[in-house]
Amino acid sequence: MAISKKKSRLTYESMLSRTPNDWDITTSALPEQVKALFPHTIDTGIKHGTVTVMCHHVGYEVTTYRIDGEYEDGRHPKQVVFTPSLIEDLKRRDFTINAMAYNDSRGLVDAFEGQQDLQKGVIRAVGEPEKRFSEDALRIMRAVRFAAQLGYTIEEETEAAMRRLSDTLTKISAERIQVELVKLLVSDHPGHMKILYETGITKVIQSEF
C-alpha cells in the first residue's frame, strides 16, 4: 500500500517494542483527496473525516487532521473542522502516550511529551484533564485500563480530574464500561482495580461488578 508522505501514525506499543494491535493513519489530505488517491475506498465516516482504503482485501482507516467542536453527549463532538495542522489534531487525543505521530519525512512528532511519559511510566491527559474527560467520560475508565495494561501510574492532576468527574460515567453505556473492565481484569496488572475504588468510580458503576 502506497502511503502519502502527508500521513502520520504511531502507537505507544511500537515505542515499547511491542507489536501494535492497530495503526492510526492520519493525514492533512481531505477525504475527497484520499479517495482520489486510491482506487478502492469506503466512506466509513466522512462526517468525521474517515475513509477506509482497501488494499489486498484489507481495510486501512485514514482520517483527516481535525479539530473537534463541543461534545454534547459525552462521547461525540457536535461538529468537526478539518485542519492542515497535525499538532491541532494531536491536541484532541486522550493521553500523551496516544498523542504521538511519525512519518518518514518528519520523524517522531511528540508535542506533548508522550515519549517522556512512556519512559516514566505515567498516564497523563493531553492538556486540561477535565476537558478531556468531559469530552468522553469513558476516558476515565481507559486511563485505569492503560495503567493496568502497562503497569503505569496515573499522573496526579489526571487522577484528580477522574475523581471529580467520576459521576459522568453514568452517561456511558454498560456495554462500553464492561469492555474496559474486562480488559483491565485480564491485564498484566489487575491489581490496578484499586484505582476504581480510590477515585470513586466503583460507586458509579457498581452494577457492572
Each language-model region and where it sits:
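Catalytic cores of the polymerase beta-like nucleotidyltransferase superfamily
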Residues: 1-209
